[in-house]
Structures are given as structure tokens and as C-alpha cells.
Amino acid sequence: MADLANEEKPAIAPPVFVFQKDKGQKRSAGSSSPEGGEDSDREDGNYRPPVKRERTSSLTQFPPSQSEERSSGFRLKPPTLIRGQAPSAGLPSQKPKEQQRSVLRPAVLQAPQPKALSQTVPSSGTNGVSLPADCTGAVPAASPDTAARRSPAEAADEEKEPQKNESSNASGEEACEKKDPATQQAFVFGQNLRDRVKLINESMDEADMENAGHPSADTPTATNYFLQYISSSLENSTNSADASSNKFVFGQNMSERVLSPPKLNEVSSDANRENAAAESGSESSSQEATPEKESLAESAAAYTKATARKCLLEKVEVITGEEAESNVLQMQCKLFVFDKTSQSWVERGRGLLRLNDMASTDDGTLQSRLVMRTQGSLRLILNTKLWAQMQIDKASEKSIRITAMDTEDQVVKVFLISASSKDTGQLYAALHHRILALRSRVEQEQEAKMPAPEPGAAPSNEEDDSDDDDVLAPSGATAAGAGDEGDGQTTGST
């Protein structure tokens, strides 16, 4: 059956027109026999073998051409038939070669050859002496990934190479064993430093000994960089130790550095100390610290005395004009003056208000006055006497409104004293009591004037009238009387 199928089926498929691809490929209902359908398909050029015949002839037929593959795209093939699995029995098969050509493989990556950098660590000897290239290890075998990527032909070639490599490695190992065993020892950084790094004196002695025994040997300082570094560091340390003695230390040798007028005792003591130090030799730093501290304190004291300038002012006797008066009340308050033009209170200042009493020289009557000075500068802002027609009113719990003579304009003005409620109450009570006493005295004097005047008492009455006029002057309307009283107050206050 297989031979008949191969003979009936042509090896090359008939040509297929492009426009005939889209024709209906279904069998007609009338073609019941598979043979009739096969003949009709052959005539049309779209031959499709039946499924049953393809199963029997799938093992022996040639691979279908490109035109047959395109035409049979809609037909379901059995899952066991895979292209290129079973070659035909009659003709030699070319499927493996076609399969190798059609399959895309990744590029074959060869194992990188070992470079000189990878060989430096195992091949390096003591102090960087490298081993010869013949004594290096064999090339490492390829990884399994690279072996899998290579083609079978390359794998077969590589199977022959291990025998050659083994023979070459054996000869290389024998050659390496013949080399000096001292060069085979690997150098590890940080190991055996005691044997390699030595002090200057020891290294120089050993170098002399080696030069005497082996004149061709090099000195260790020429090859070992650690010895060169240690020698330079030790030289620097010795130089720094010598220079440290000359460094500046705070608090030492202040007698030489602080410019102060020297005293005879200090100069002699310093000279004796220097001579004693020169004779006895160098002393310890702890023993030298004690006299230097003393000299530092002495020189500092002398320096401060020389530079300090004391500005002492001469004591001056302070005269306030209140020496003949006795203070009754003093308090901290704020003083305001009423401005008629702006109809507002203007602050005059704050300070200490004092109420003083003084004895009159004429008849022994009591006189009082209010004195206020600003805080700090002690500038006089209020200086007025108390008289009988003086007006006093308590504006609030913390303020008192009074009429007094202004020291600047020599005019009676309205003042406002603002203080605490306690001080305000005490001041108001003291002022009210003294003003009432003055008024009672004026009334008594007026009653004494009422009887008929006597001829011998006329001059005395005129003098009393003049005194009454002076007392009532602040409340009068004439400006001349106010000016006279102001002059009298200023002279009395000063």
C-alpha cells in the first residue's frame, strides 16, 4: 500500500494559481467515493489526500511542499504526525540537515582565556615577585552552559582536547616543581609583618650582615616600602619631639612676653632663678611650672596696676534747699499739666514727690511746700507753696487735681498728680489738713482787724494789711500780685 501511494502521488505538486486559493474547498455532496473525489481534485490542481490514506502513507511520503502546506492549513492533522520525526523507508532522508538549517541557535560563546590579572594572586611571591608563566595553573574547564550551546561537531573536537591538556599540565607541573620553593609561597597582605617590617637600626644591621655575606643582595629598604615609610615617620617624630620643646605653651615665660614695668626685686629673683637653673641643669616640667605660675600672677597684677586708670571725682556737697525743712510724705507719682490751648493733659514727668514743712521766722507759723524731681536726672518739675486759697480736688481714687505755681512760666496752672490709691489718699489728707489750717489763720487775722483802729496802732495795721495781701495774692485776678508772689517763692526755695 505504501508503494502504491508513493507511485500514484507525484513528488512535485502541481502549480497552484493565486486566484484559485479562495475557491471553495469543500467536497460536493455527489462525490461519495474517495477515489472520485481524488480524481476531481487532481484535475483542479487542489489535490488533498484523504485522512485515512495520509495515515498509511505519512511514514513513506516526502515532506510536503510549500504549496501543499498552504492548502492544507485548514485540515486537522493527527497529533502523532510531527514533521521531521520519521524518515521515509524508500528514499534517503534529508530531514536532519534541513532541521539543522531551519533551527535558529544562539551564538556559540567560547570560554574567555585567563589573563595576567587573574594569575597575579596565585603566582605572586614574597614582596610582589611574580612566578613564571609556565607554572601557572591549567586553563579552567568550560562551564556546562557553554558546553550545551556548542554544536555536536565542536563537542566532539573538545573530547579530544582533554587528553592533550592533561599531558601538557603534567609536564607544566613537573617544570614548576623544579623551580625554587621560596618563590612558590604566595604573598598575603598583612601576614608575617614581624618578619618583614623591622625598625631602622635592626634593618640596617641586618643589611650590613647580608651585604658582608652576600654582596649581591639588595638592602631591605630598597625593596620593602614599609621600612621606607617607618624610617621617614621615625625621623619626623624625632624632629617633632625636638621642636615640641620650643612650642608656645600658654602661661609659660610670661615675664618675657608680658610688657610690664619690672621691679627690682623681681629682676633679681629672675636672675637668681636663671643662674640656678643653668647650674643645676635641666629640670622636670612639673618643677618648672610652680615658679612660672607665680611669675605669671605677679606680672598680671603689675600689668593691671599699670594700665588701670581710676577716675575718682571729687566729693561735692549737695545742696537741695531742703536742709531746713522736715519731710512729711514722699511717694512715686506722675505729674500732668493742663494745657488751655489744646484742652488736654500734658505729661510733665515722673519721679519723687515730697511734702515738706518749715517753721516761719516771723511769727512761728507752719509753712509747707510741694517739691517734685524727675527720676534719674533729678530735674525740678514742681516747686510750690501751700496757701489758703489753693484749690485741691480728688479727681479719682488714684489722682488728685490741684492748683499750683508753674516754675517755668511763673503762672498759676492746674496740675494732676497720678499715683497709687494709698499714696493718693495720704497726700490728699495731708494737703487738705494744711490748707484748712492756713484758712483758719487768715480768718483769725481778719477778725482781729474788725475792731476800731487805734491811732498808735495804725502803722501796725498797715503792715498786717500788707501781709494779708501777700497771702491772698495767688487767688487774685491781678497778674502783678501773682508775679510778686512767684518771686518770693523762688527766692525762698533757693
UniProtKB/Swiss-Prot annotation:
Keyword check for Secreted: no
Bias type Polar residues, positions: 57-66, 116-129
Record's comment on post-translational modification: Phosphorylation at Ser-58 promotes its import into the nucleus.
Record domain RanBD1: where: 305-445
Biased composition (Low complexity): 274-289, 476-494
Residues recorded as bearing Phosphoserine in the entry: S32, S33, S40, S58, S151, S260, S280, S282, S299, S466
Bias kind Basic and acidic residues: ranges: 1-10, 43-56
Motif interval(s): Nuclear localization signal: 49-57
Main localisation: cytoplasm
Modified residues (Phosphothreonine): T56
Region of interest (Disordered), ranges: 1-192, 259-300, 442-494
Source organism, top-level taxon: Eukaryota
InterPro entries, alphabetized: PH-like_dom_sf, Ran_bind_dom, RanBP1-like
GO cellular component terms given for this protein: cytoplasm; nucleus
Gene3D superfamilies for this protein: Pleckstrin-homology domain (PH domain)/Phosphotyrosine-binding domain (PTB) (2.30.29.30)
Pfam families: Ran_BP1
Listed Acidic residues bias regions: 461-471
Keyword flag Acetylation: yes
Modified residues (N6-acetyllysine): K9, K21
Keywords: Acetylation, Cytoplasm, Nucleus, Phosphoprotein, Protein transport, Transport
Annotated positions of the N-acetylalanine modification: A2
GO annotation terms (biological process): protein export from nucleus
UniProt-annotated location(s): Cytoplasm; Nucleus
Self-association and partners: Interacts with CHC1 in a Ran-stimulated manner. Interacts with XPO1. Interacts (via its C-terminal R domain) with SMAD2 (dephosphorylated form via its MH1 and MH2 domains); the interaction results in the nuclear export of SMAD2 and termination of the TGF-beta signaling. Interacts (via its C-terminal R domain) with SMAD3 (dephosphorylated form via its MH1 domain); the interaction results in the nuclear export of SMAD3 and termination of the TGF-beta signaling.
Its job: Acts as a cofactor for XPO1/CRM1-mediated nuclear export, perhaps as export complex scaffolding protein. Bound to XPO1/CRM1, stabilizes the XPO1/CRM1-cargo interaction. In the absence of Ran-bound GTP prevents binding of XPO1/CRM1 to the nuclear pore complex. Binds to CHC1/RCC1 and increases the guanine nucleotide exchange activity of CHC1/RCC1. Recruits XPO1/CRM1 to CHC1/RCC1 in a Ran-dependent manner. Negative regulator of TGF-beta signaling through interaction with the R-SMAD proteins, SMAD2 and SMAD3, and mediating their nuclear export.
Protein name (record): Ran-binding protein 3
